[in-house]
Amino acid sequence: MKATTYAPFAKPLYVMVKPVGAVCNLACEYCYYLEKANLYKENPKHVMSDELLEKFIDEYINSQTMPQVLFTWHGGETLMRPLSFYKKAMELQKKYARGRTIDNCIQTNGTLLTDEWCEFFRENNWLVGVSIDGPQEFHDEYRKNKMGKPSFVKVMQGINLLKKHGVEWNAMAVVNDFNAEYPLDFYNFFKEIDCHYIQFAPIVERIVSHQDGRHLASLAEGKEGALADFSVSPEQWGNFLCTIFDEWVKEDVGKFFIQIFDSTLANWMGEQPGVCTMAKHCGHAGVMEFNGDVYSCDHFVFPEYKLGNIYSQTLVEMMHSERQHNFGTMKYQSLPTQCKECDFLFACNGECPKNRFSRTADGEPGLNYLCKGYYQYFQHVAPYMDFMKKELMNQQAPANIMKALKDGSLKIEY
């Protein structure tokens, strides 16, 4: 009889792969990763070798304690590697699978998608994440190529190819100072293009100059860096979430899946939220650069958060090191008193540590910059979440909330 698990109490080990490092055909103004190329100026080509690809795939699969293994390919722009690279990766995955089930997901800006790419993704059941920031006016505000030309038209051509070939895809949408002002235009766009799985990523960056040419601040650096102009404000973020939620809860529950709403309901239920930012602890998802360097997190690719290199340490040694364990547990331990006493701690968990550079009303450091927006959102959705939680506990569908709101059996009063 075949065992269904390799270590029943273990968690999967995740390391996201950067096969081209930070190399990209776009130059999005708010990109947090583009400047990471400055960390590797001594490398003439930021391209993962076939030798490293094989070493990583063998070790990554072998380090898993579960029967399912997920590979996540990230950039830079992942499609700047030729299709042959990913075909080779799949051959190696089969070679080293050792009976495990292998899944792949890939994040792309969508501009380089072709029929050939889409056929490959469909035939091999890859999940494709596409970066798109809403309608053309919003998307093209910051997502331009290196010549300063807008990218929306090419992205939509790519999305239409994914649809044509029946590829499973979802959207990663950055919420910034501009598109946050138009939440319903933003949300309705995704419904119009029939995108049923959407992740909102609020952009918050601070500017601190480095000698190597980088200009984005890490959490470990001074807290006084000036906020980047494109950053979404706490008030914008709260209003954005509440406005879209009000539309979604009346019309779209069970039809359109918005990650933050799903994660909020999971936390309301006492389940795992499925996204690191809203979990009590993080640190379970590392990232490996094109040369084998491993970092604590995709948003912490700074020298001070480098765990080592796969040529000198194993993935297990790095991802289960005391240093990485401390990185993950500090998400909770470093919360200020205001957070630990907050009614919505269970739902928020302080969000991502990278955004915790504000001070509380008492002057304590470590408050999330977006706290005010999140608090507004959680306070707003609480009665709806209570209803959906009750439905789930009675083995009923959360989507029943739409009927309850329409027939008046659920009345929300603030």
UniProtKB/Swiss-Prot annotation:
Its EC number is 1.1.98.7. Pathway: Protein modification; sulfatase oxidation. The keyword Cell division does not apply. Keywords: 4Fe-4S, Iron, Iron-sulfur, Metal-binding, Oxidoreductase, S-adenosyl-L-methionine. Residues 5-250 form the Radical SAM core domain. Changing C276A: Still contains 4Fe-4S but lacks activity. Changing C348A: Still contains 4Fe-4S but lacks activity. InterPro entries: 4Fe4S-binding_SPASM_dom, Aldolase_TIM, Anaerob_Ser_sulfatase-maturase, rSAM, SPASM_anSME, Sulphatase_maturase_rSAM. GO terms for molecular function: 4 iron, 4 sulfur cluster binding; metal ion binding; oxidoreductase activity. It catalyses: L-seryl-[sulfatase] + S-adenosyl-L-methionine = 3-oxo-L-alanyl-[sulfatase] + 5'-deoxyadenosine + L-methionine + H(+). The active site is at D298. Belongs to the radical SAM superfamily. Anaerobic sulfatase-maturating enzyme family. This is Serine-type anaerobic sulfatase-maturating enzyme. It comes from Bacteroides thetaiotaomicron (strain ATCC 29148 / DSM 2079 / JCM 5827 / CCUG 10774 / NCTC 10582 / VPI-5482 / E50).
